[in-house]
């Protein structure tokens, strides 16, 4: 009898132990499954966060224009040394497609070094195509020709090509300053210059005097609705257009006298100079004797503080 009772107790204990073991196993399995589930959830959350961050970065890049495949022309041209622009011959300049194309020309050849450094620090989205020659001083750069390495006859021969006229060419610059070059050179009028369709929001700059301002506004009123900026040069600053004696396009003496008359800006306190360009010598002599006269003062169109005489320039947006 006693042996049977002990066996029954042992069997009960074994059954209870088995039940407890099964319960413990289930608890352990539940804990492991919960841990695995939490780990999977953490991995999914991390992947979703990475996707959200990547999509936000792409949206910001597309908004600011950082995802452009081609680098801007200003950064590519500024990677070259400063002396390469003045030391290249005329043939290499005319054969270079990046210089012969007006919208892709570098602006740094007409600006000072401080302005060029500021332009390089700007992102590629804000690098709008600034005009290469907003004032009629560097006439050689309007057709992709370096004015320091080319003669006046070369500039005259390259300027009358009507298919390569930019909004700041010889025709527009002389007509804006009061010289009626359409009657002398018989250039056709261009209300929409080439390259303006590519950048419709880029303003077009014109230089005018007080006498020619009504004629310019009447002429620009019939043009298309592009942003335009007129730089008004008042009287009394030495900017008097000299009579253009060279009616013939091949007369280099007339162009030289006209340039010396137009560039006679009395600006004693200069802040933005180009000594490296005026010190260069071309094939026909020094370029400073006809492009920059002793009384002429080349200045940077983007420099904020030139002198007290340049503070009277009035910009009018149409």
Swiss-Prot record:
Residues 41-48 are annotated as: Leucine-zipper. PROSITE patterns: BZIP_BASIC (PS00036). InterPro entries: bZIP, bZIP_sf, Sec_Metab_Biosynth_Reg. It comes from the Eukaryota. Residues 20-52 form the bZIP domain. Residues 1-27 have a biased composition (Basic and acidic residues). Keywords: DNA-binding, Nucleus, Transcription, Transcription regulation. Residues 25-40 are annotated as: Basic motif. One of its GO terms (molecular function) is DNA-binding transcription factor activity. It is found in: Nucleus. Induction: Expressed during copper starvation via the regulation of both aceA and macA transcription factors. Residues 1-39, 71-107, 123-171, 269-318 are annotated as: Disordered. Disruption phenotype: Virtually eliminates the production of all pathway metabolites, including fumiformamide, melanocin E, melanocin F, but also the sulfated xanthocillin derivative BU-4704 and xanthocillin X monomethyl ether. Belongs to the bZIP family. Transcription regulator that specifically up-regulates the gene cluster that mediates the biosynthesis of the isocyanide xanthocillin and its derivatives. This is Xanthocillin biosynthesis cluster transcription factor xanC.
């Amino acid at each position: 009898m006693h042996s049977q009772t002990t066996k029954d107790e042992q069997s009960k204990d074994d059954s209870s132990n088995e039940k407890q073991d099964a319960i413990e196993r289930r608890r352990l399995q539940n804990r492991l499954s919960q841990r695995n589930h939490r780990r999977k959830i953490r991995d999914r959350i991390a992947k979703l966060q990475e996707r959200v961050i990547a999509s936000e970065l792409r949206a910001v890049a597309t908004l600011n224009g950082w995802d452009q495949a081609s680098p801007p022309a200003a950064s590519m041209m500024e990677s070259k040394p400063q002396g390469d622009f003045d030391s290249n011959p005329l043939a290499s300049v005319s054969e270079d497609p990046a210089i012969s194309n007006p919208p892709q020309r570098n602006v740094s050849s007409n600006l000072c070094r401080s302005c060029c450094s500021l332009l390089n620090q700007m992102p590629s989205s804000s690098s709008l195509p600034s005009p290469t020659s907003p004032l009629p001083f560097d006439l050689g750069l309007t057709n992709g020709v370096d004015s320091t390495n080319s003669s006046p006859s070369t500039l005259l021969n390259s300027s009358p090509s009507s298919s390569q006229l930019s909004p700041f060419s010889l025709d527009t610059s002389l007509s804006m300053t009061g010289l009626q070059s359409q009657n002398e050179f018989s250039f056709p009028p261009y209300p929409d210059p080439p390259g303006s369709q590519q950048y419709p929001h880029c303003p077009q700059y014109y230089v005018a005097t007080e006498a020619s301002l009504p004629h310019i506004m009447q002429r620009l009123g019939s043009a298309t609705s592009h942003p335009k900026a007129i730089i008004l040069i008042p009287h009394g600053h030495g900017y008097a257009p000299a009579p253009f004696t060279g009616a013939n396009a091949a007369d280099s003496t007339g162009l030289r006298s006209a340039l010396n008359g137009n560039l006679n800006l009395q600006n004693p306190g200069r802040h933005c100079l180009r000594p490296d360009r005026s010190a260069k010598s071309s094939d026909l002599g020094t370029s400073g004797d006809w492009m920059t006269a002793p009384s002429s003062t080349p200045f940077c169109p983007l420099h904020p503080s030139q002198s007290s005489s340049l503070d009277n320039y009035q910009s009018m947006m149409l």
